[in-house]
UniProtKB/Swiss-Prot annotation:
It comes from the Bacteria. This is Cellulose synthase operon protein D. GO terms for biological process: cellulose biosynthetic process. One of its GO terms (molecular function) is identical protein binding. It comes from Komagataeibacter xylinus. Pfam families: Cellsynth_D.
Length: 156
């Protein structure tokens, strides 16, 4: 006799939790909480030291594959002193978030912040900004988050 075990599905729980967090504490507090969760996740699984952005991208994609959280493309923009981070296939928590379906995006901000700053010679005091205009205009595939990581003193 074959017994099929259903794996737990946390979708309903996460959707309800996302709505409650947003209602109870508001968007700003929620975003900071999720960034901190991302930093914690980044501490639990860290990339090895990488000498190039290309090698770091390969290592980050290997870590993302472990947790089933999509893929990333990194591009160093030396003229802006920034790192362009394009994350594709972010898991969704239903339609939660702004734009819709991007509730977990602040987790990525914390995650990439931890991972990138763990590298030798990386940004120290940094800020991560999302390109929500591109996300809103559907200029990128659904579940794609575009972020820029800059040294805080040169951020606008």
């Amino acid at each position: 006799m074959t017994i099929f075990e259903k794996k737990p599905d946390f979708t309903l729980f996460l959707q309800t939790l996302s709505w409650e967090i947003d209602d109870q504490v508001g968007i700003e507090v929620r975003n900071e909480l999720l960034r901190e969760v991302g930093r914690g996740m980044g501490t639990r699984i860290m990339p090895p030291p990488c000498q190039t952005v290309d090698k770091l991208q390969i290592e980050l994609n290997a870590l993302l594959a472990l947790i089933g959280w999509g893929t990333v493309t990194l591009e160093l923009l030396s003229e802006d002193q920034s790192l362009r981070i394009v994350h594709e296939n972010l898991p969704q928590v239903g339609s939660a978030g702004e734009p819709s379906g991007t509730w977990l995006a602040p987790v990525l901000e914390g995650l990439y912040g931890r991972w990138v700053t763990s590298q030798a010679g990386a940004f120290g005091d940094y800020v991560v900004t999302r390109d929500v205009d591109a996300e809103d205009l559907n200029a990128v595939p659904r579940q794609t988050i575009i972020m820029y990581m800059r040294v805080r003193s040169s951020a606008t």
